[in-house]
């Protein structure tokens, strides 16, 4: 996204991809959160979308992005304005496809209605939080998107790191972990840092061992069992973490394992469709 690391994430990625054949990879980014101090340096107004996209292309050193996403829903901008701007970006060739992140079913349905009425290009992807512990999309967002041909690209399949098992009940969080980093996600992980959840997570480790997986691999594999998902986003601070996590790709979990997981954590799972992992300060 444009705002990660104060826009530096896109700059670093652009440099890393220099010399790599553009057709060999897919590039995704997002817009919404503040990228500067100005009133128009945020949100989904036509002005910010156009300026943000142009700035992202410059930082990424490319002529287009494959998927451009609304990082959140903007309650202060008319939806027609936002969708019109996205449509113009596609028609200009700067964007190939559009999507959204953390929108609820009502917002998605409203957008699709406008896109169909106006003849705009439709959304093709949803990027919500989803994990064993966070299933708020299952009751409303997934059925709607499935019916409308919108796939899920989920984030935080290991619940901000809680589903690695490194956070132990009754003990302080490891130094340097997300739970101790107030600028790097301590608030977001707080909903999972409860004793009943941490105790249950430890009980998942023997289940992972049964299928020769680490707990993180089991968590990612669990997410990928959902047929409505196209992919899962994994984060890492070390190369070894990436090597471990990608081993979950292609793993098939049988029903007995899936049932065993639900037996351990079923009562602790968040399913409320009204919940959002990152509260919208503009809502």
Task: Tell where the protein language model's regions lie, with residue ranges.
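Generic structural signal for well-ordered alpha-helices
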Residues: 10, 14, 53-57, 83-87, ...
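Conserved, mostly hydrophobic/aromatic
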Residues: 1, 13, 27, 56, ...
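Glycine/proline-rich, positively charged
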Residues: 36-140
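A cross-domain feature marking catalytic cores of carbohydrate-active enzymes
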Residues: 1-2, 29-31, 72, 100-102, ...
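Terminal-tail/helix-coil boundary detector
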Residues: 147, 171-211, 225-230, 237-283
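N-terminal binding-site loop/beta-alpha segment at the start of enzyme catalytic domains
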Residues: 1-24, 63, 91
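Aromatic-lined glycan-binding groove of carbohydrate-active enzymes
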Residues: 137-178, 214
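Glycine-rich beta-alpha junction loops
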Residues: 31, 104, 130-134, 156-163, ...
């Amino acid at each position: 996204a444009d705002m990660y690391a104060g826009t530096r994430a896109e700059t670093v990625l652009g440099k890393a991809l220099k010399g790599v054949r553009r057709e060999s990879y897919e590039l995704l980014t997002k817009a919404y959160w503040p990228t500067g101090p100005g009133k128009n340096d945020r949100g989904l107004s036509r002005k910010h979308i156009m300026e943000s996209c142009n700035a992202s292309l410059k930082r990424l050193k490319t002529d287009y992005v494959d998927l451009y996403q609304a990082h959140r829903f903007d309650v202060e901008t008319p939806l027609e304005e936002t969708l019109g701007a996205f449509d113009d970006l596609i028609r200009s060739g700067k964007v190939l496809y559009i999507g959204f992140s953390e929108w609820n079913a009502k917002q998605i349905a409203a957008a699709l209605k406008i896109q169909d009425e106006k003849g705009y290009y439709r959304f093709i992807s949803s990027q919500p939080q989803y994990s064993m512990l966070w299933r708020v999309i299952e009751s409303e967002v997934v059925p709607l998107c499935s019916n409308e041909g919108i796939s899920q690209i989920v984030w935080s399949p290991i619940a901000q790191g809680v589903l690695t098992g490194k956070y132990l009940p009754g003990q302080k969080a490891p130094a340097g972990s997300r739970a101790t980093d107030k600028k790097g996600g301590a608030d977001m992980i707080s909903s999972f840092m409860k004793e009943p959840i941490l105790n249950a997570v430890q009980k998942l480790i023997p289940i992972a061992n049964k299928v020769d997986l680490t707990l993180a691999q089991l968590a990612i594999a669990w997410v990928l069992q959902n047929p409505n998902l196209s992919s899962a986003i994994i984060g890492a601070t070390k190369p070894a973490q990436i090597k471990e996590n990608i081993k979950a790709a292609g793993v098939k979990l049988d029903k007995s394992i899936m049932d065993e997981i639900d037996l351990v954590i079923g009562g602790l799972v968040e399913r409320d469709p009204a919940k959002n992992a990152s509260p919208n300060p503009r809502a």
